[in-house]
Each structure stands twice: as structure tokens, then as C-alpha cells.
Amino acid sequence: MIIVETTFNKKEDAESIVSFLLEEKLIACATYKNVESSYIWKGTIENEKEIEVSLHTSESLFPKVIENVKEKHPYELPRITTIHPLYTLPEYEDWVNKETTN
């Protein structure tokens, strides 16, 4: 299992992409967190409230998840990162793999 993470400034944008990924069986689950981000963008320090989304997918599908998130993301340069958990409950990983198999 791999977790793909990204951020959005509007929950509607996050939900739209998550719905697409779920319908296409590219992810089994998504979680949302409210976060505050500070970063330098085009020479200016920005402070924004964002929604961080964690997308749970199988190892075989994470490249497709990244491709779709990048293509549909409203940001000019989205943060898209992956996390490979040190441990995942085997039953949970089995469920993720089952739900993301066509």
C-alpha cells in the first residue's frame, strides 16, 4: 500500500478528485485534514489554510493516481508526495488491494 498526499485550497476541488479516483477504483480510501501551510511562491511568503488529502492505493496503481491528481489539480504546482508506510495492518492492506483491483 502507498499513500499519495496532496493539498487543496478548496474542499470541493479535493472532493471532486477523490470522487473520480474512487469511481475509477484507483484508490480505496481518502482522508482529509485541515492544515495551515507557509511557503515561498514567486518570491512572496504565503500563509494559507488548505485541506491535506491522503489517498490510499495499491503499489501497482500509485503512478496512475499521481498522473490523475497532477492532471486534474487546480494548482499550477501541486504538492504531490508519496508515503510508503513502515507497517500496515495486513487486513487493511488486503482491503486496499482488493478495492483497487479491476
Language-model regions, residue ranges each:
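Positively charged, small/polar-rich N-terminal and surface patches that mediate targeting and assembly
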Residues: 1-102
